[in-house]
Amino acid sequence: MLHDIGKGYSAHHEAIGSKIAVKVAKRLGLSESVQNCIGFLILNHFLLPLTSERRDIHDPATIKSVAGMVKDARRLKLLFIVSICDSMAVSKTRFNSWRKMLLTELFDRTLSYLKNTEEYFKSDMYYIENATETAKNLKGKRGYNFLKGIKDLNGFITGFVNQFYSPGKYLTRESSENILLHLKLFSKITPGHRFNFVAKPHIGEDYYEIIICGEDKKTMFSDITGTLSYFDFNIMSADINTRKDGRFIDTFFVNHIYKKVDGDIDWHKLRNTFFNVFNGNISLEDMLKNKRKSESLYKKSGPRVSNSVEIYNNISGEFTVIEIQALDRKGLLYDIGRIFNVFDINIFASKITTQGNKAFDTFYVKNDQGGKIRNPLYIRKIKQAVINEI
């Protein structure tokens, strides 16, 4: 009831609202510990929703940061309840199954961290052993014939995982089932068949998990996001995995703008378009330009959006984090990806959030040397180039 009491006083109403709520609690005769708890909950009632939507919740630094703010499991549970109630009250359509899933996963991960910090950071071998057990169960089953002749499954999976530039990151993000699915997709890559993809429907949550693998190239992110945008997919999140053997496997979490997950989507046409775009047979830029032109005839104007680009090196221990706020439009990620290509920026994860006509895009990136982007002049040039494009 008190969480939005500060609205109307300032843009960041949670800070002043927290102070007002503490005064109210004091007048009601509540104990000092309850007063402090109420103040904390109101001050931080955006923490879990914004973190789950705009930060990489598989990055240990994210979980450590949230845990450091909430301090204990009881406060985390109370904050989770406030977050759920507030999100549901704002809008039933805004608090969809995807956002609920992200919020719940952030809560679960942070709770596990608070309960047993040492156990939370499991070794790579723990995940590989789980994947090995899954491989044993799948061996000989339809679609997994490539496992038949492999005697040392543990060594085989370890070798596969170690080809990623960030094997630890890959293992903590992917389930054992997905790791085996990736191996299956890679087993079908040949010189004449340079990419493979599969779309996994999540009907209850109303989104697709589109997994794409193949021979890596500089424009891969912009090629994929541009093609998905052309086919009217809304990209909500992406995990980007590049490998030392020149291959990639990327996962895009998407929903369709016009169709439900159980709707009729022409996957064959999407596959053919991917093939032609990857091989340079068609111009994705021209395709998007024509589609934007036709859609602009029917698009209604909305509120103005202030474009902004912020670049941080203190959010993640491993990555530079780039936050972009812009007017949402078809092909926005494609345009951002092209700018990143110019500056040799490699994307490892992205979180995409939209509120009305406003897009909040967060990218976890490295430079072409595999490190953070730290040069102040280079950072200014990146910011200006992105602002000019969006």
Predicted segments, located by residue:
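Divalent metal-dependent catalytic cores for phosphoryl transfer on phosphate-bearing substrates
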Residues: 1-120
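Regulatory modules associated with amino-acid/nitrogen control
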Residues: 65-390
